[in-house]
Amino acid sequence: MAKPLKQQKIAVLLGGTSAEREVSLNSGNAVLTALRNQGFDAHPIDPKEYPVAMLKEQGFDRVFNILHGRGGEDGTIQGLLEQIGLPYTGCGVMASALTMDKMRTKMLWKAFGLPVADMEVVTRTSFSQLNPQVVVEKLGLPLMVKPSLEGSSVGLTKVNAIDDLKSAVEFALQYDETVLIEEWLSGDELTVPILGNEVLPSIKIVPQGEFYDYEAKYIADNTQYFCPSGLTEEREQELRQLVKQAYDVVGCRGWSRIDVMLDGEGKFRLVEVNTNPGMTSHSLFPKSAATVGYSFEQLVVKILELSL
């Protein structure tokens, strides 16, 4: 018989080595404080300094994984935890690895008939054959260029002129071997949290700049968030169903946040999955959960209870 959660020793994995280390440290400290306030035996563990493979030997029973980006959100730490036999929060190995790859996630959604932006894929090796004219004829202008793998909107560029396309792709190639060139979606940006099997209310994101980049996500205070997002009940319901399908198709579990854009005609287009959403004071998941009655601490405990 497993020990009750309150008697278990919980490792809060935070920090790590990805480009999103700072965000993860902030999220991790918030989660740690919440768990301790709720009477849990929780300890901060930074994989940059501590060998995660030793956690079980050190008497830990369970992991709250709040690492962001590569190494923490891409299936590798999940695989390690499976190997040593420790239950952990969030998605498993396959869903974590898949959703870290924006291109393959979109291809899978598309195969299931779910709506995504039209895109072209460029790799480091195919870059020399890139023909901006052909791309623009297919996708129009402006365009969004982004690395397939890096999180937190690192390496993004909005391309307004055909002559700027190559340099934008070169910039994105600094962050990843594979780059997506996507049609520009001109409508609202929404994000939808999912907790277990419960789809929480959508949030509308209104950045003051051109789009929601790293600065707007984590630093700026002038990005506006609206929850409820202002959709009609009917549209919210449609969005809820779409997001739940998208979540199930890629095999998510525990909790995730799915980003959605509206195109020029007001149709929903799936953008990406965040399998370890931020849990800082700026973060969107707790904002949405609060509107249906979860305090930050209750939310953290619920995520822990969903761990497998």
UniProtKB/Swiss-Prot annotation:
EC number: 6.3.2.4
Co-factor binding comment: Binds 2 magnesium or manganese ions per subunit.
Pathways per UniProt: Cell wall biogenesis; peptidoglycan biosynthesis
Residues binding Mg(2+) 2: 272, 274
ATP-grasp domain segment(s): 106-305
Protein function: Cell wall formation.
Gene3D superfamilies found in the cross-reference section: 3.40.50.20, ATP-grasp fold, A domain, ATP-grasp fold, B domain
Top-level class of the enzyme under EC nomenclature: ligase
Keywords: ATP-binding, Cell shape, Cell wall biogenesis/degradation, Cytoplasm, Ligase, Magnesium, Manganese, Metal-binding, Nucleotide-binding, Peptidoglycan synthesis
PROSITE patterns, alphabetized: ATP_GRASP, DALA_DALA_LIGASE_1, DALA_DALA_LIGASE_2
Organism: Histophilus somni (strain 129Pt)
Residues that coordinate or bind ATP: 136-191
Pfam families the UniProt entry points to: Dala_Dala_lig_C, Dala_Dala_lig_N
Cofactor(s) required for function per UniProt: Mg(2+); Mn(2+)
Catalysed reaction, written as an equation: 2 D-alanine + ATP = D-alanyl-D-alanine + ADP + phosphate + H(+)
GO cellular component: cytosol
Keyword Cytoplasm: yes
GO biological process per UniProt: cell wall organization; peptidoglycan biosynthetic process; regulation of cell shape
Listed name of the protein: D-alanine--D-alanine ligase
Family: Belongs to the D-alanine--D-alanine ligase family.
One annotated GO molecular function: metal ion binding
InterPro entries: ATP-grasp, ATP_grasp_subdomain_1, D-Ala_lig_Van_CS, D_ala_D_ala, Dala_Dala_lig_C, Dala_Dala_lig_N, PreATP-grasp_dom_sf
Subcellular localization: Cytoplasm
Binding site for Mg(2+) 1: 259, 272
